[in-house]
Protein backbone atom coordinates (compact mmCIF):
# COMPACT_ATOMS: atom_id res chain seq x y z
CA UNK A 1 0.00 0.00 0.00
CA UNK A 2 1.39 3.38 -1.02
CA UNK A 3 0.81 6.83 0.42
CA UNK A 4 0.68 10.10 -1.50
CA UNK A 5 1.27 13.34 0.40
CA UNK A 6 0.17 16.87 -0.44
CA UNK A 7 3.52 17.58 -2.10
CA UNK A 8 3.09 14.71 -4.53
CA UNK A 9 5.56 12.39 -2.81
CA UNK A 10 4.79 8.67 -3.08
CA UNK A 11 6.00 6.31 -0.35
CA UNK A 12 5.48 2.70 0.67
CA UNK A 13 3.06 2.82 3.61
CA UNK A 14 2.62 -0.92 4.17
CA UNK A 15 5.17 -3.18 2.51
CA UNK A 16 3.42 -6.53 2.89
CA UNK A 17 -0.26 -5.73 2.59
CA UNK A 18 -1.51 -9.30 2.31
CA UNK A 19 -3.02 -8.72 -1.14
CA UNK A 20 -5.02 -5.69 -0.07
CA UNK A 21 -7.88 -4.35 -2.15
CA UNK A 22 -10.44 -1.79 -0.94
CA UNK A 23 -9.44 0.67 1.81
CA UNK A 24 -11.38 3.04 4.04
CA UNK A 25 -10.42 5.32 6.94
CA UNK A 26 -12.51 5.57 10.11
CA UNK A 27 -12.92 8.54 12.45
CA UNK A 28 -9.92 7.41 14.52
CA UNK A 29 -7.67 7.31 11.43
CA UNK A 30 -7.53 3.53 11.41
CA UNK A 31 -7.22 2.24 7.86
CA UNK A 32 -9.56 -0.67 7.19
CA UNK A 33 -8.40 -3.12 4.55
CA UNK A 34 -10.30 -5.72 2.53
CA UNK A 35 -7.90 -8.52 1.60
CA UNK A 36 -8.43 -10.57 -1.55
CA UNK A 37 -7.39 -13.79 0.18
CA UNK A 38 -10.19 -13.82 2.72
CA UNK A 39 -9.94 -11.38 5.61
CA UNK A 40 -10.65 -7.86 6.82
CA UNK A 41 -8.10 -6.00 8.96
CA UNK A 42 -7.36 -2.53 10.21
CA UNK A 43 -4.07 -0.73 10.70
CA UNK A 44 -3.72 1.89 13.44
CA UNK A 45 -2.01 5.25 12.90
CA UNK A 46 1.04 3.79 14.69
CA UNK A 47 1.24 0.99 12.11
CA UNK A 48 -0.16 -1.91 14.14
CA UNK A 49 -2.17 -4.26 11.91
CA UNK A 50 -5.00 -6.32 13.38
CA UNK A 51 -7.01 -9.01 11.62
CA UNK A 52 -10.65 -8.31 12.49
CA UNK A 53 -12.32 -11.24 10.76
CA UNK A 54 -11.62 -14.01 8.28
CA UNK A 55 -14.72 -16.14 8.91
CA UNK A 56 -18.48 -15.97 9.21
CA UNK A 57 -20.51 -18.71 10.90
CA UNK A 58 -17.37 -20.81 11.23
CA UNK A 59 -16.60 -20.77 7.50
CA UNK A 60 -13.92 -18.83 5.64
CA UNK A 61 -14.89 -15.61 3.93
CA UNK A 62 -14.49 -15.63 0.17
CA UNK A 63 -12.53 -12.61 -1.04
CA UNK A 64 -13.39 -9.30 0.71
CA UNK A 65 -13.32 -6.58 -1.90
CA UNK A 66 -14.42 -3.13 -0.78
CA UNK A 67 -15.38 -1.28 2.40
CA UNK A 68 -17.75 1.51 3.46
CA UNK A 69 -17.93 2.99 6.96
CA UNK A 70 -21.10 4.44 8.49
CA UNK A 71 -21.16 7.44 10.78
CA UNK A 72 -21.89 5.10 13.71
CA UNK A 73 -18.51 3.46 13.12
CA UNK A 74 -19.84 0.20 11.71
CA UNK A 75 -17.87 -1.36 8.86
CA UNK A 76 -19.65 -2.71 5.80
CA UNK A 77 -17.86 -4.84 3.22
CA UNK A 78 -18.52 -6.89 0.12
CA UNK A 79 -17.31 -10.48 -0.27
CA UNK A 80 -17.25 -11.73 -3.88
CA UNK A 81 -14.97 -14.54 -5.08
CA UNK A 82 -12.26 -12.90 -7.21
CA UNK A 83 -9.16 -13.60 -5.11
CA UNK A 84 -9.85 -17.30 -4.65
CA UNK A 85 -11.42 -18.02 -8.04
CA UNK A 86 -9.16 -16.21 -10.53
CA UNK A 87 -5.41 -16.51 -11.01
CA UNK A 88 -3.30 -13.42 -10.60
CA UNK A 89 -4.55 -12.05 -7.29
CA UNK A 90 -1.88 -13.82 -5.24
CA UNK A 91 -4.21 -16.10 -3.31
CA UNK A 92 -4.51 -19.85 -3.05
CA UNK A 93 -7.29 -21.09 -5.29
CA UNK A 94 -10.07 -22.71 -3.24
CA UNK A 95 -13.79 -23.32 -3.25
CA UNK A 96 -16.15 -20.77 -1.77
CA UNK A 97 -17.25 -21.86 1.70
CA UNK A 98 -19.91 -19.20 2.18
CA UNK A 99 -23.29 -20.08 0.62
CA UNK A 100 -23.65 -16.51 -0.70
CA UNK A 101 -21.39 -13.70 -1.86
CA UNK A 102 -22.45 -11.41 0.88
CA UNK A 103 -22.57 -7.86 2.12
CA UNK A 104 -21.53 -7.88 5.76
CA UNK A 105 -21.50 -5.50 8.70
CA UNK A 106 -18.89 -5.42 11.47
CA UNK A 107 -20.20 -3.66 14.57
CA UNK A 108 -18.93 -3.95 18.14
CA UNK A 109 -16.74 -6.83 17.03
CA UNK A 110 -19.65 -8.87 15.63
CA UNK A 111 -19.92 -9.84 11.96
CA UNK A 112 -23.44 -9.96 10.49
CA UNK A 113 -24.57 -10.93 7.00
CA UNK A 114 -26.89 -8.20 5.73
CA UNK A 115 -27.76 -9.60 2.31
CA UNK A 116 -26.62 -12.20 -0.17
CA UNK A 117 -28.88 -10.95 -2.95
CA UNK A 118 -26.21 -9.36 -5.17
CA UNK A 119 -24.59 -11.90 -7.49
CA UNK A 120 -21.04 -10.48 -7.48
CA UNK A 121 -20.98 -7.56 -5.01
CA UNK A 122 -18.05 -5.23 -5.57
CA UNK A 123 -17.94 -1.49 -4.81
CA UNK A 124 -19.99 -0.20 -1.89
CA UNK A 125 -20.90 3.31 -0.69
CA UNK A 126 -23.49 5.05 1.47
CA UNK A 127 -25.37 8.17 0.42
CA UNK A 128 -24.42 11.22 2.48
CA UNK A 129 -27.58 11.02 4.58
CA UNK A 130 -27.13 7.22 4.86
CA UNK A 131 -30.68 6.61 3.71
CA UNK A 132 -29.30 4.48 0.86
CA UNK A 133 -26.54 1.96 0.30
CA UNK A 134 -25.17 1.60 -3.22
CA UNK A 135 -23.65 -1.75 -4.23
CA UNK A 136 -21.97 -2.43 -7.57
CA UNK A 137 -22.77 -5.81 -9.13
CA UNK A 138 -19.93 -6.93 -11.38
CA UNK A 139 -22.05 -9.73 -12.82
CA UNK A 140 -24.09 -7.33 -14.96
CA UNK A 141 -22.55 -3.88 -14.41
CA UNK A 142 -25.61 -2.62 -12.52
CA UNK A 143 -25.39 -0.53 -9.36
CA UNK A 144 -28.13 -1.57 -6.96
CA UNK A 145 -29.59 0.73 -4.35
CA UNK A 146 -30.89 -0.46 -0.99
CA UNK A 147 -32.85 1.58 1.49
CA UNK A 148 -31.24 1.56 4.93
CA UNK A 149 -33.76 0.81 7.67
CA UNK A 150 -31.87 1.01 10.96
CA UNK A 151 -29.39 -1.85 10.71
CA UNK A 152 -31.15 -3.59 7.83
CA UNK A 153 -31.18 -3.29 4.04
CA UNK A 154 -34.59 -3.23 2.37
CA UNK A 155 -36.20 -2.48 -0.99
CA UNK A 156 -33.30 -3.42 -3.25
CA UNK A 157 -33.66 -2.09 -6.78
CA UNK A 158 -31.44 -1.65 -9.84
CA UNK A 159 -30.40 1.99 -9.80
CA UNK A 160 -27.96 2.78 -12.63
CA UNK A 161 -25.68 1.18 -15.21
CA UNK A 162 -22.78 2.82 -17.02
CA UNK A 163 -23.90 3.60 -20.56
CA UNK A 164 -20.89 3.73 -22.87
CA UNK A 165 -21.59 1.54 -25.89
CA UNK A 166 -18.35 -0.32 -25.25
CA UNK A 167 -17.99 -4.08 -25.45
CA UNK A 168 -17.74 -6.08 -22.22
CA UNK A 169 -14.33 -6.97 -20.79
CA UNK A 170 -13.33 -10.48 -21.98
CA UNK A 171 -12.71 -11.70 -18.42
CA UNK A 172 -14.92 -9.54 -16.20
CA UNK A 173 -17.85 -8.65 -18.46
CA UNK A 174 -19.63 -5.35 -17.84
CA UNK A 175 -17.84 -3.93 -14.84
CA UNK A 176 -19.18 -1.84 -12.00
CA UNK A 177 -16.35 -1.60 -9.50
CA UNK A 178 -15.33 0.87 -6.78
CA UNK A 179 -17.58 3.83 -5.91
CA UNK A 180 -17.49 7.16 -4.10
CA UNK A 181 -20.08 9.80 -3.19
CA UNK A 182 -19.11 13.49 -3.22
CA UNK A 183 -20.39 16.28 -0.96
CA UNK A 184 -23.19 17.04 -3.43
CA UNK A 185 -24.42 13.44 -3.39
CA UNK A 186 -23.14 12.61 -6.87
CA UNK A 187 -22.04 8.99 -7.22
CA UNK A 188 -18.82 8.09 -9.03
CA UNK A 189 -18.71 4.54 -10.41
CA UNK A 190 -15.57 2.96 -11.82
CA UNK A 191 -16.20 0.82 -14.86
CA UNK A 192 -13.01 -1.00 -15.85
CA UNK A 193 -12.02 -0.26 -19.43
CA UNK A 194 -15.19 1.82 -19.80
CA UNK A 195 -13.64 4.50 -17.57
CA UNK A 196 -15.76 5.94 -14.79
CA UNK A 197 -19.17 7.56 -14.74
CA UNK A 198 -20.69 10.30 -12.62
CA UNK A 199 -24.35 9.98 -11.63
CA UNK A 200 -26.56 12.58 -9.99
CA UNK A 201 -28.41 11.61 -6.78
CA UNK A 202 -31.51 10.88 -8.88
CA UNK A 203 -29.61 8.42 -11.09
CA UNK A 204 -28.92 10.51 -14.20
CA UNK A 205 -25.56 9.81 -15.87
CA UNK A 206 -23.87 13.21 -15.96
CA UNK A 207 -20.55 12.30 -17.52
CA UNK A 208 -18.42 9.36 -18.66
CA UNK A 209 -14.66 9.86 -18.44
CA UNK A 210 -12.10 7.51 -19.97
CA UNK A 211 -8.61 8.25 -18.62
CA UNK A 212 -5.56 7.97 -20.84
CA UNK A 213 -4.16 4.44 -20.60
CA UNK A 214 -0.60 5.69 -21.08
CA UNK A 215 2.02 3.64 -22.90
CA UNK A 216 1.58 0.40 -20.96
CA UNK A 217 0.82 -2.73 -22.98
CA UNK A 218 -0.64 -4.54 -19.97
CA UNK A 219 -4.19 -5.89 -20.41
CA UNK A 220 -5.07 -3.82 -17.34
CA UNK A 221 -3.82 -0.57 -18.92
CA UNK A 222 -6.58 2.02 -18.71
CA UNK A 223 -8.64 -0.20 -16.38
CA UNK A 224 -10.41 1.95 -13.78
CA UNK A 225 -10.79 -0.14 -10.64
CA UNK A 226 -11.44 2.28 -7.79
CA UNK A 227 -11.74 5.89 -6.69
CA UNK A 228 -11.27 8.04 -3.60
CA UNK A 229 -12.23 11.59 -2.72
CA UNK A 230 -9.68 13.74 -0.90
CA UNK A 231 -7.60 16.87 -1.06
CA UNK A 232 -7.63 19.84 1.34
CA UNK A 233 -11.33 20.51 0.79
CA UNK A 234 -12.48 17.07 -0.36
CA UNK A 235 -12.52 18.52 -3.85
CA UNK A 236 -10.23 16.05 -5.61
CA UNK A 237 -11.04 12.68 -7.12
CA UNK A 238 -8.23 10.12 -7.09
CA UNK A 239 -8.72 7.36 -9.65
CA UNK A 240 -6.72 4.12 -9.91
CA UNK A 241 -6.15 3.46 -13.62
CA UNK A 242 -4.11 0.33 -14.30
CA UNK A 243 -0.81 1.02 -12.51
CA UNK A 244 -1.41 4.79 -12.45
CA UNK A 245 -3.12 7.20 -10.07
CA UNK A 246 -4.94 10.01 -11.87
CA UNK A 247 -6.22 13.04 -9.93
CA UNK A 248 -9.14 15.21 -11.06
CA UNK A 249 -10.49 18.42 -9.54
CA UNK A 250 -14.15 18.20 -8.56
CA UNK A 251 -16.08 21.30 -9.59
Regions found by a protein language model. Give the residues of each.
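A short loop-to-beta-strand structural motif that recurs across blades of beta-propeller domains
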Residues: 1-2, 39-41, 101-104, 142-144, ...
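Loop/turn-rich, solvent-exposed surfaces of beta-rich toroidal or solenoidal domains
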Residues: 137-147, 161-205
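Short loop/turn segments immediately following the C-termini of beta-strands
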Residues: 36, 80-82, 138, 148, ...
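Beta-rich, blade/repeat-based domains predominating
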Residues: 16-37, 57-75, 97-102, 113-132, ...
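Short loop/turn segments immediately following beta-strands, especially the blade-tip
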Residues: 145-153, 203, 249-251
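Beta-propeller fold detector
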Residues: 11-15, 50-54, 113-116, 154-163, ...
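Short, conserved, GDST-rich strand-edge loop motifs in beta-rich repeat architectures
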Residues: 77-97
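Beta-propeller domains
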Residues: 1-12, 36
Amino acid sequence: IYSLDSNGNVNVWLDDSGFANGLSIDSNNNIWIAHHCGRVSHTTPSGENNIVTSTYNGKKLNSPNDIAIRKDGSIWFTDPMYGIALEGFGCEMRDEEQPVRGIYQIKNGEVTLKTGSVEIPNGIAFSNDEKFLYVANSADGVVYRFEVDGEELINKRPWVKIESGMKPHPMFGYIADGMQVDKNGNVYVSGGHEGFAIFSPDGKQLELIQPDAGSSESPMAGFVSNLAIGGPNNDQLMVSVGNQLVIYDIK
